[in-house]
């Protein structure tokens, strides 16, 4: 047996070489530049052994094949030429694997992503496990890049151009059965026989070539290709609004390879990779990736977490049902739901059933796995089954006396160590804990709706919350698959506080006569997933505006909204999508059509709806207020760092990730430019735009939020 630090070569008695991949000291296999020499040494031994019948690449890790290339390698590149060279080195290594004279099989279990999939594509065949952990994809676009080790050229030839474009442009990950159907893998087997199945495949002298479906063959021809690429360019431009240069380059590179041959395609891929690596968009997206990775490792406090074996939930409504699902089905923890009536419990159980049944229908999980996960959730109209719960999450109405009553009941009916976590979005945690016998075990845990989709949670300790309570709550959030940030117990916390002025300004422009669709389109063009008016419709106009009075009472007039407008809309029974009446028209459920503004909205608020501002002016008015408030939160230590502020905004409200978050964006603009812009807007629109003291100080001292010690690199 010959060993290297990350790759182990073992030639079996049946003359099949098994190359086991195991990056030492790491939970996950990633490809690093220094591994190239190790792989080449193994490939040399394989070429020299004339008795070999085949080769199998397999991971020695428990639940991943190769999760991608080490992104830190890109950060070490000083210019586009160095990044291009990095890509060419990867291409050359993959070409050497593909050129081996015997069948080469990739045996895949777990994540096979980015450079890992490019390596698998260089193998002659791929076989994977039917495990839920097994996913295959090329997610480089999410970092503002494209696959740089041959992925843009091999994937279209393997699965067809339309499937490849869809995978590479979106970064989507395919599960085992989806990969088999697409032709990405040749077989799907149980994990227990993965190696033997791969060895048997490697022994076959002739590996039959897969024929592409008729549709893909037509699209690969000159006429079909021209039509497809024209359509894809148009759709991609609509989706990205020109904010993500990687998508355009991906299309160009794939088209070059198909039209001019793979040699030209590989050359175009390497050049595009080098250029994209130096773009501000890729640098920002990589910064978000590293920041989110750091946040996920952050324990929240220096204290060790307490026990976390079971959870209780008070309230079986929309939020309670969603929290139950992420706790049981993602966290694997037993959940007991208490509601005042059985209808609430049934609603919460159905919520989880519907989500799990969708997974079964899509073949993501099997029916027995659905039943196993659902069995973790139970309910009661009293506190039976709560005595041993380690943490109880309260998800009842936003009513302070009611929440204080919940604290008292939990302290009476649960264990002495039980933590009480409130899902409040607006009430101070200190007030909720005011009458608590054990205030050190009361904390805020603010989820965003819909719970199963939104990745962020805010963990909110009040003045008396213990360090262990913080650590335990952060641990739970991570188990639930969430990205937690710890924020201070101040009105609006962080996310809602920076979102409110953004929404307020959109409503104010509406009262000035700007059209709904013009306001929303301007912010989508800026980079938000949806505009502020549509966002209000989606979360519920009543829900989205109820925090405004709380913020106005705490921080003054800068949070005041055109109250008569909001009241007029709510008095007209307009709550948004949830009751089919909002700023937009809602047709029959299930029908997909372009969103149309309800023309009655203009009459309701007494304007004609004629836009006068440019899209840039609309976006500037909304975004600058959000940035100014984020800077205040930094100054007041509502957030612990610029990192947390960026992650909170990107994951909590969809702040454009290609800008890196509000603090990286402010650093890019420069504090001097921020202050000058805010002063200009204040002169035009009033004192709500006055730059906060933090920005003025930073402009004077030429400081930045992200200090020089905080790099874009991962640790």
UniProtKB/Swiss-Prot annotation:
Keyword NAD applies: yes
Pathway: Lipid metabolism; fatty acid beta-oxidation
EC code: 4.2.1.17, 5.1.2.3, 1.1.1.35
Catalytic reaction equation(s): a (3S)-3-hydroxyacyl-CoA = a (2E)-enoyl-CoA + H2O; a 4-saturated-(3S)-3-hydroxyacyl-CoA = a (3E)-enoyl-CoA + H2O; a (3S)-3-hydroxyacyl-CoA + NAD(+) = a 3-oxoacyl-CoA + NADH + H(+); (3S)-3-hydroxybutanoyl-CoA = (3R)-3-hydroxybutanoyl-CoA
Gene Ontology BP, a term: fatty acid beta-oxidation
Region 3-hydroxyacyl-CoA dehydrogenase, annotated ranges: 306-715
Record has tRNA-binding as a keyword: no
Localization, UniProt: Cytoplasm
Keywords of this entry: Cytoplasm, Fatty acid metabolism, Isomerase, Lipid degradation, Lipid metabolism, Lyase, Multifunctional enzyme, NAD, Oxidoreductase
GO MF term set: 3-hydroxybutyryl-CoA epimerase activity; enoyl-CoA hydratase activity; long-chain-3-hydroxyacyl-CoA dehydrogenase activity; NAD+ binding
Matches recorded under CDD domains: crotonase-like
Pfam family, one: 3HCDH
Function noted in UniProt: Catalyzes the formation of a hydroxyacyl-CoA by addition of water on enoyl-CoA. Also exhibits 3-hydroxyacyl-CoA epimerase and 3-hydroxyacyl-CoA dehydrogenase activities.
NCBIfam families according to UniProt: FadJ, PRK11154.1
Stated family: In the N-terminal section; belongs to the enoyl-CoA hydratase/isomerase family.
Protein name, UniProt field: Fatty acid oxidation complex subunit alpha
The organism of origin for this protein: Salmonella enteritidis PT4 (strain P125109)
